[in-house]
Amino acid sequence: MSDINATRLPLFFPPDFRPPCVGDADNFTLTRGENLC
């Protein structure tokens, strides 16, 4: 995993973690928290 992906995610979410409420799985790495429940 790139550190860039880790920095875009909240610190309490592991790089491999995908919130079940996020509808845009393709945009997961681009999620800034707006799509998180």
UniProtKB/Swiss-Prot annotation:
Residue runs in coiled coils: none
Record key words, sorted: Toxin
UniProt modification remark: Processed by the macrocyclase-peptidase enzyme POPB to yield a toxic cyclic decapeptide. POPB first removes 10 residues from the N-terminus. Conformational trapping of the remaining peptide forces the enzyme to release this intermediate rather than proceed to macrocyclization. The enzyme rebinds the remaining peptide in a different conformation and catalyzes macrocyclization of the N-terminal 10 residues.
GO molecular function: toxin activity
Tissue: Expressed in basidiocarps.
Cited InterPro entries: Amanitin/phalloidin
Disulfide cross-links: none
Domain of life: Eukaryota
Cyclopeptide (Leu-Pro) crosslink residues: L11-P20
Positions of the propeptide segment: 1-10, 21-37
Known role: Probable toxin that belongs to the MSDIN-like toxin family responsible for a large number of food poisoning cases and deaths.
Similarity comment: Belongs to the MSDIN fungal toxin family.
Protein known as: MSDIN-like toxin proprotein 5
Source species of the chain: Amanita exitialis (Guangzhou destroying angel)
